[in-house]
Every structure is written in C-alpha cells, then in structure tokens.
C-alpha cells in the first residue's frame, strides 16, 4: 500500500502551452535532455542531419515545424516521475489543446521574450484559468534581442490578468545573455555556452556577494543586476503558493531553451513547487488520487500513430490508484468489463508496454473502436463517471466526398476514425449516405490535415467544397416534431456521429429566427462527450 502511495507522490503531470514559434517544442526536448531521456537535442528549425524534434512525430509536423497533435512523454528526474503533455501550438487545434489540459495538473506557459504575450497565449491561458490551474511561465529566447524584463512582467499582468513573481532574473539579453540570478537562494548562475544547446550546459554558481562575478559578467551587467535586484525586492508581489495553486499568481523564469541557459534551474524549481496528482470531479463527488481503486478517463484518441501498425490508441489519464497490466476494468459508457490490451507509455512515436502505472500517469491502450473522448474507466466495484469533456462548436465547414466512388469504404473508415479522435466533427445530412458528408472544424488547418491523412493513411483522394456555414447548435430540447422545425432557407438540420440532432447556420440572424419561430426550442453551442 505504502509503495503505491509513494509512487503517486512522485508524479508530476503538466502541459506546455504557447503561441506558435515561442519555443515550446524546443523546451520540451530540453526537459528530456536533462532527464536523460535523449542524449543529443536536435534543433527543431535547423533539422540538421535529419534530427527532428522528439515530440513532432507526425509527418506533416516534421514538414511544417509545428505541433498539430498532442504528444505524451514520460521521464524521471531528481526523484520525480514526470509526464509532459506537449500541446498543439497552432491555433487551429485549440480543441485538442483543451482536452490535453484536462489531463494535466498544471501548465507551463512559454512566452517569447521579444514578443511578449501573443494571441494564442491569451486563448490557451483563458482555458487554463477556467480550470484554475497552476501556471508557471518560462520567458524564452533571452539569447536574442528581448524586451525589458520589467516590461514583460507588466505585459503578462495587463494582458492576462494574473500576478507575476519572478523566480529568477536574467543577466543581460541577446549576445550578452550571461545567466540568471536565483532569487530564492540569492545565487548567480553564470552560463558557459559553446555546445549550441545540444548537451547540458555548464554553469558557474555562487553567492551574489561573490566578487568574482563582477569580472565574469563585466561591470556594467553586474551593476545593472544589483539595481534590478533592489527594485524587485521593493516593488514586487510576495510569492504566495496558495495563489499559485489556484492560478492567480504565476512564478516566472527567464532563459533560453535553444542554448539550455536557465532550463535546469527552471525544471528544479518547478518540480519543487508543483503538486502531485490532484483530485478529480465525478458524479459521486471528488475522486482522491490516493484512493486504492483504479480510475481513468480518455482524453485523446490517435489512429495510425505508426503506419506499419495501422493501430488506434486511446490515451488515458489515470486519476486514482494503481493500474496493473491485464487488470479488469469497467467501461462506463460501454457498460461492460474490459481487459485493457497492451497498455503502453510513449516517448513520441516510440512506445513500450507497461506492467503498472499510477495516478498521474498517461497510458495508451489499443482501441478497437469502442472508446470516445471523455469516457470513464473504473474498478468494477466502484462505478462512477468523471465530468465530461465539452465539444467545441466548429466555425468552418466543408462538404467532403471521395474522388473515386469505389473507395467509399476506405473514405468512411478514415473520416470515422479521424472524427473519433476529435480532430474533426462529421455531420450527416438527412437522406444522404456516408459517401458525402459535412465536416466541421475549429480552425482551417484541420482541413489540410484531414486531406493529408486521408491520402497518406487511407489512400483516399477527396473533393472538398467549403460551405458558408459559421455556427452549429445542438438541439437540447424541443416541444414539437424536429422534422417540422421552422428554419431559414440557409440553415440546415444535420446529425452528428452520436446521432444527436443539430442545426448549422450561416449567421446569428438564422439562430435568432429559429429560436423565435419554434416554441420550446433550446439550442446549445457545446456538446458534452458523456452524453
């Protein structure tokens, strides 16, 4: 018993969020470098000697240098077992990011030191704040020309409405970025570069009072640091861990993921300050992670992670207890007992079978097509459902059909699997078969990914016609006959994959018309996955 409790206490499960190009994937890779999970870090942009970022495993990601799927990686560091959820950096994949954040206990927000808070940072931060998650900020790219650090803190507070507490302070920036000052321990960490970030960086550490740093840093930088320290001590907020835990205050770290400057100090402080797995809400109350009964929920489904395997993996966040390979669990939505075949843990596309896993861990299990996002798995002796994960209303629509009608079977299989992953939403028109469907997406890049994946994974070329619809609403209730709804000529009634009735509209006026002309009609912009 004590063993499994100690294992859970070691777990730290967090997601990394950022605007595209702020350096999120590079930072993820450097965590793995320091954790000993990889020996040599390859630059994401340079792609030297064909080294690709460990977490960017889908071919389209390698070509574009962006993350469009969420990757899951586990490694050990300093007595902790760390689960990193690397989220899509592209704004068109915000729904996938939201689901990933549901599986995390805290978030690391990466901010570009030259640009400050950017559009996608705001959106992702908003999702984190809705969950009242602890958020830790890493201000990246200090090795390039950067904004004034005080200005960056002000920017975060003004743009995001969260207080900041700098845990360390940069010494210089751009080519003069020499290191960081650790405020907690009142120590200077001066970096000795030269390996271009491919291996762990060497550092000279010592007390801020040590005169040798005047020589190492140069008088101008040393004097500026002393002035900044004084200003911070007078003007800044106190570090209130209770406010950190509820997402009202963010500890801020400065560094450069590319050169590794500041990565290890950040990782060490972060692990000290974050918590082990947190309790989760369910229909029977909070589920304690230290409960001895296993429970988990599905937050992601990924088909064809390996083209050679043609497989489909359901990713689960374990929320309580211990999971043992071959253990019988109860699938609430399916209403039956299961044995989870070959539970796996991942380092991007590399996988290994696990014998056991604990609350906080992410495991992948083979999915023969029975799981959906938000499903609960629990011990047969203690049945309950975790809170569902909402479905975002798509904003872009297209009519999609296979170019070759003889490939209808592959087309249906492909769109079904990609829809079950949550990457697209598929709508069926009344009296029209599956040979032609309407696809809804949150962002237009998802159309490109759909086309790419159908061709590369299912050998199906598609014809895609964009539609003028902008809104989808689920029909929650209606007093009359749904087939006789009074709608404008440019609105269309459809069904989703769960056979729920929806209406797609071109504008707000169409929505208001439907509500005004159909007594008792209740519409919702969100579909719950546990329905």
Regions found by a protein language model. Give the residues of each.
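Structural and coupling elements of P-loop NTPases
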Residues: 1-531
């Amino acid at each position: 018993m004590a063993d499994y409790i100690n294992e859970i206490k070691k777990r730290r499960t967090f997601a990394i969020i950022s605007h595209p190009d702020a350096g999120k994937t590079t930072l993820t890779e450097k965590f793995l470098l320091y954790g000993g999970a990889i020996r040599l870090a390859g630059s994401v942009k340079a792609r030297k000697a064909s080294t690709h970022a460990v977490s960017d495993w889908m071919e389209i990601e390698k070509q574009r240098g962006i993350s469009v799927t969420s990757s899951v990686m586990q490694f050990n560091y300093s007595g902790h077992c760390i689960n990193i959820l690397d989220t899509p950096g592209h704004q068109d994949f915000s729904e996938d990011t939201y689901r990933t954040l549901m599986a995390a206990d805290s978030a690391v927000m990466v901010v570009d030191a030259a640009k400050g808070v950017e559009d996608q940072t705001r959106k992702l931060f908003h999702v984190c704040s809705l969950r009242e998650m602890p958020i830790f900020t890493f201000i990246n790219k200090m090795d390039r020309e950067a904004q004034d650090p005080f200005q960056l803190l002000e920017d975060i507070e003004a743009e995001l409405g969260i207080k900041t507490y700098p845990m360390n302070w940069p010494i210089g920036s751009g080519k003069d970025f020499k290191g960081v000052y650790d405020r907690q321990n009142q120590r200077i960490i001066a970096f000795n570069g030269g390996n271009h970030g491919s291996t762990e960086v060497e550092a000279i550490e010592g007390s801020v009072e040590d005169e040798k740093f005047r020589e190492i840093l140069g008088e101008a930088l040393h004097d500026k640091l002393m002035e900044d320290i004084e200003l911070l001590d007078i003007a800044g907020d106190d570090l209130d861990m209770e406010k950190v835990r509820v997402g009202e205050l963010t500890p801020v770290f400065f560094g450069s993921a590319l050169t590794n400057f500041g990565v290890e100090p950040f990782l060490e402080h972060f692990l000290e300050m974050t918590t082990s797995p947190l309790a989760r809400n369910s229909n029977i109350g909070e589920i304690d992670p230290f409960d001895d009964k296993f429970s988990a929920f599905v937050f992601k489904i990924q088909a064809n992670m390996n083209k050679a395997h043609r497989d489909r993996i359901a990713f689960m966040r374990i929320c309580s207890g211990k999971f043992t390979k071959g253990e019988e669990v109860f699938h609430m939505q399916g209403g039956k007992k299961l044995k989870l075949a070959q539970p796996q843990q991942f380092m991007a596309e590399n996988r290994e079978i696990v014998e056991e896993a604990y609350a906080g861990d992410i495991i992948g299990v083979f999915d023969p097509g029975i799981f959906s996002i938000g499903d609960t798995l629990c011990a047969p002796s203690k049945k309950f459902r975790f809170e569902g994960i909402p479905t975002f209303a798509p904003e872009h629509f297209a009519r999609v059909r296979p170019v070759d009608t003889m490939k209808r079977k592959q087309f249906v299989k492909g769109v079904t699997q990609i829809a079950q992953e949550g990457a697209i939403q598929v709508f069926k028109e009344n009296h029209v078969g599956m040979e032609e469907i309407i696809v809804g997406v949150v962002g237009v890049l998802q159309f490109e990914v759909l086309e790419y994946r159908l061709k590369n994974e299912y050998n199906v070329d598609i014809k895609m016609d964009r539609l003028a619809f902008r809104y989808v609403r689920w029909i929650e209730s209606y007093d009359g006959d749904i087939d006789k709804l009074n709608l404008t000529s440019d609105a269309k009634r459809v069904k989703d994959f769960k056979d729920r009735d929806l209406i797609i509209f071109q504008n707000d006026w169409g929505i208001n018309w439907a509500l005004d002309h159909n007594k008792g009609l209740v519409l919702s912009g969100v579909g719950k996955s546990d329905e």
